[in-house]
Amino acid sequence: MLKTKIYVTALLSFAFKIMFAQSVIQVSHFDKVIVSPHIEVTFIEGNEEKVIIENSTVSEDKINIKVNGKTLRIYLDDAKEVDKTETINENGNKVKRPVYTGTVVSATVIYKTLEELSVRGEETFVCKSVLKGEKFRLKIYGESEVYLNEVSLEELRTTIYGESNLVIKAGSVKEQKYIAYGESTVNSLAINNNTTKITVYGESNFQLNVSDEIKLTAYGEASVEYKGNPTITKGLHFGEIKINKID
């Protein structure tokens, strides 16, 4: 009897996951995406715009997928901007706990065009397709891991708040601009780049491959390792700056 109950429970759990794996939400046109905490997303270019829920530990009615203007927002109830807490009784004491912990939803976003991406939380985000165009804006909040598999851009503007990690794996960007608040890490050694402008508030590390010029302004501690033969231009800086060429 016990084995039967365990089997049924496992079967129901599996069926629950399969149901979400088959959950596809068609959406209207967008070119900007905002992802809130506890949601892990992979971005893929395609012929139709939709969101696929690959896996979830909450019921579907708690997952919000909305397009306003040309902005797609994906968020959970009680975690649109930041985590909310709930009060529970624990051994006779009232204790506040976050509504969600860890990654709750894994999703895939299929887009036609993507010009701006804003992510929040501690999840992993992967742009699998080539990001191409005149300008791409990236905003990272929290302790996220962001991977851009390939880029072909005239300009990449990135703002990082927190202790996040950005890796760009291949391609080219004519002009990079970074503003970093906190202890972020950026690795774009694998791409071709003409100029990079960096403004740091805190402690950030950059690994770059630049041909023409690196401009650096730092209010804190900044570390820059680079390949290429760019001119190094230092603006205002308070704190320790380390700039090293990689052979």
Which functions belong to the PLM regions below?
Residues 166-247:
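Short, surface-exposed interaction patches in beta-rich subdomains
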